[in-house]
């Protein structure tokens, strides 16, 4: 199946239809699982980061408002993940010998060199999760493009290798095209609409069309829902 975003109606509501293919995973495996850790702590909306207000999208607080000043409770919630939570998760995966993919927000990784080094030392993949953990829906295209480029440069500088996976999470209608413009990604996970990986035809800004492997993100398994 190829999802063609270049058609006049760019959404594909049909997919594999009634007869999805057998994935034929290596070694006869019945299922492929990608364990993902979203590392966003220190990349969220915060006036200290130059943002207009505090984070409100994702936290243990119910329906929090965004304030145009520091929100100390919200900051503390995010700091827990960086100070304690991430180390607990890394220990559990190390004990079990399981690999992780870290969807790392570049500025969050930059603010915690120790945890970034641990991800690398433990052999976990670091995929790019954007420069900042913000909504990009209304961010101007030139700014979003600059953020993408800066994020990739930061991760390469911190880890010594370029990120091969991409996931924004709070993307815009322009994100996939900008990712295709940058190029070189093994996969893009900014999609929730399927169980199986597939190829997507994406039109770049220069008009050329390129195939991009999509590895869908199973948002219903994200523990933020619980």
Role assignments for model-derived ranges:
Residues 2-215:
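Catalytic alpha-helical scaffold of carbohydrate-active enzymes acting on polysaccharides/glycoconjugates
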Residues 211-226:
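A conserved mid-domain beta-alpha-beta active-site/ligand-binding segment of alpha/beta enzyme cores
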